[in-house]
Design a protein with these regions (language model features):
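Solvent-exposed loop/turn segments connecting transmembrane beta-strands
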Residues: 20-30, 56-67, 94-101, 131-138
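Residue-level signature of outer-membrane beta-barrel architecture
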Residues: 36-38, 72-74, 112, 126, ...
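Mid-chain, well-packed structural core segment of small domains
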Residues: 79-106
């Protein structure tokens, strides 16, 4: 399984592309990004396997987000369900004004193991400032993911 595989190999890179803020016709934009997960720092808890993540993305409108947080890996027998939470720093560039530099990303991902060290997945996230700013429009995004374990 992927969870056992990652225990032995150390870390995983997730390369993704998708549609940033797809629910806002005026602000939606193509995004590309990456995420690194260090399995050597994982913790088995009553919630499952939790490990740290760090990553970022940029949109076609030069908006950028860098983050660090945690993810849970739930092995569903060939499929992996991965919810995550990550605070980060957002720069709007020519893209959407999310109301604050500090934003929080909540995400769910479902991936399928295509080989011992590779998976493909789909994910959905919501980025929001939790009302820290004067406005909090948020952004909903979906992505297609390629995950490689090293």
């Amino acid at each position: 399984s992927l969870a056992t595989e990652k225990d032995k190999n150390g870390h995983q890179l997730n390369f993704f592309t998708g549609n940033f803020d797809f629910s806002d016709d005026k602000q939606k934009a193509i995004l590309i990004g990456f995420q690194q997960q260090d399995e050597s720092l994982y913790r088995n808890t009553f919630l499952g396997n939790i490990s740290p993540i760090t990553g970022g993305f940029i949109t076609e409108n030069s908006a950028a987000y860098i983050y660090t947080g945690i993810e849970w890996n739930v092995d569903l027998g060939g499929m992996i369900f991965t919810p995550s939470f990550a605070p980060g720093l957002y720069h709007e560039g020519d893209g959407k004004d999310l109301g604050h530099v500090l934003e929080f990303k909540s995400e769910v991902q479902l991936s399928y193991e295509t080989s011992e060290k590779s998976s493909f997945g789909v994910s959905y996230n919501h980025v929001s400032n939790a009302s820290l700013g004067n406005k909090n429009p948020g952004a909903n995004s979906y992505m297609f993911n390629f995950l490689k374990t090293f």
